[in-house]
Structure formats: C-alpha cells, structure tokens
Amino acid sequence: MTLPKFVITMDGVFRLGMVNQHKDLLKPGDQCIGGGYYHFDFISNRIILDRSSYDFGKPKWHLWETLKVPSTYRGLRIIYKYDDGFHDDFNVSDELAIEYYD
C-alpha cells in the first residue's frame, strides 16, 4: 500500500512521494539519515512532516545547514511535528537554508 512518505539524504536532499517503503525514494548511492510521513496543508501553504521511517528513523535536523527541496514546492513552508509531548515543532523553513532543485 502506498503512503505519503519522505526521506532526507546525507547530502541534505529532501524527497517525497507516494511509495510502499521509504527506500523507494532513494537513488543509487544515496545514504538516508531520516524520513517519515507528510501531508499538505493548503490553507496555510505548508508541508507538514511527522513521525519517522521504520528503517531510517526521524530526521536528524542538526546534521544539515541547507535542505535541498524540489522546486515544485517553492513557496510552501516546511514544518516537522514531533508529536511526542516533549519537543516543539521544528520549523524547517526558518531553521535551515532552503535550496531548490529541479
């Protein structure tokens, strides 16, 4: 069953899509160091990220200064919700430099 999932590679490349497994979003040679699930909040122009990848765990935001995002998502803010009762939401768009790619 395909679900809306995302991954982030060691190089800071952000990929998302409807896939069976998070690894289906990786290209040969990619090293994934975090992933989870996503949904679009069109009212507030945001991509909401949450949960974690069973295989790769939660994104390790402290490892990146720049996140490389597909240019299709230009103009959308990116937020990661921990939903664990301990952490505040992580505003990816404010905390990391966003670089767009085609």
Where are these regions (language model features)?
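Eukaryotic phosphoinositide-binding membrane-targeting regions
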Residues: 1-102
